[in-house]
Amino acid sequence: MSESLRIIFAGTPDFAARHLDALLSSGHNVVGVFTQPDRPAGRGKKLMPSPVKVLAEEKGLPVFQPVSLRPQENQQLVADLQADVMVVVAYGLILPKAVLEMPRLGCINVHGSLLPRWRGAAPIQRSLWAGDAETGVTIMQMDVGLDTGDMLYKLSSPITAEDTSGTLYDKLAELGPQGLITTLKQLADGTAKPEVQDETLVTYAEKLSKEEARIDWSLSAAQLERCIRAFNPWPMSWLEIEGQPVKVWKASVIDTVTKSAPGTILEASKQGIQVATGDGILNLLSLQPAGKKAMSAQDLLNSRREWFVPGNRLA
């Protein structure tokens, strides 16, 4: 086996916890875990630990939860662990240059795209939103830029017509640990081959917002269908009817030319609610009114047919 490395792990959500779990089974020595401070969650706004903290405490690992790594005393926490490498997965804090240079082999990051495409905060969602044929994970050496470091290892996965951000998240949460363990072996053996990112191929994955997820009927049906999958499970595509938000869980594209204005309801039946768009027809299949569970178009029509009268326009 390769040399056992002393590793600091830094991460916060479930996606990161799956990588920590793989590390703990890999024969390497996780000497400390950094994660975001506990946050209020749920209706009672009770302070809740991150999935990474829960796993780390189960395994008896030292856990550190600084609000920032800029203060000298917090940087000293990293230095005192004398790590060979720091593994960063969806941590959520900026690592100052001093921290990046502390481990012997530096800091590496698992990023949810095939860099240099989709640097930034929402790579999984943006790959769907843009209609990419594939996505994947990139293990990269971290530097002070935003996802600009040299690439150490990549694994790809096709994007299917049924994928949502939720299903892609799960696929990449399986791929990421595989790539991470392989990269650590190469770093330990001295066989890693860093590859500089091609700046001419860079795209940026901007954060999602609830406002962006509001359905814009002037877009094409194909674009809107991709948005619905990209924004599932958050923030969820939505439209407004009688002042109420209605989430859209699933839709399909009907590739038919229509002269009706975008947003016009063309047909409402058990096969779906057909709406004119800027190009083509979007067939709404599964919706969720405020305060209700998601339901089929048929079930919603049974209770709210007046919302979907053909000829009316959706805002």
From Swiss-Prot:
(6S)-5,6,7,8-tetrahydrofolate binds at residues 113-116. One of its GO terms (cellular component) is cytosol. InterPro entries: Fmt, Formyl_trans_C, Formyl_trans_C_sf, Formyl_transf_N, Formyl_transf_N_sf, Formyl_transferase-like_C_sf, GART_AS, Met-tRNA-FMT_C. Gene3D superfamilies: Formyl transferase, C-terminal domain (3.10.25.10), Formyl transferase, N-terminal domain (3.40.50.170). This is Methionyl-tRNA formyltransferase. Keywords: Protein biosynthesis, Transferase. It holds the Pfam family Formyl_trans_N. Its EC number is 2.1.2.9. Attaches a formyl group to the free amino group of methionyl-tRNA(fMet). The formyl group appears to play a dual role in the initiator identity of N-formylmethionyl-tRNA by promoting its recognition by IF2 and preventing the misappropriation of this tRNA by the elongation apparatus. It comes from the Bacteria. Belongs to the Fmt family. It is an enzyme of class 2 (transferase). GO terms for molecular function: methionyl-tRNA formyltransferase activity. Signal peptide: none annotated. CDD domains: FMT_core_Met-tRNA-FMT_N (cd08646), Met_tRNA_FMT_C (cd08704). It catalyses: L-methionyl-tRNA(fMet) + (6R)-10-formyltetrahydrofolate = N-formyl-L-methionyl-tRNA(fMet) + (6S)-5,6,7,8-tetrahydrofolate + H(+).
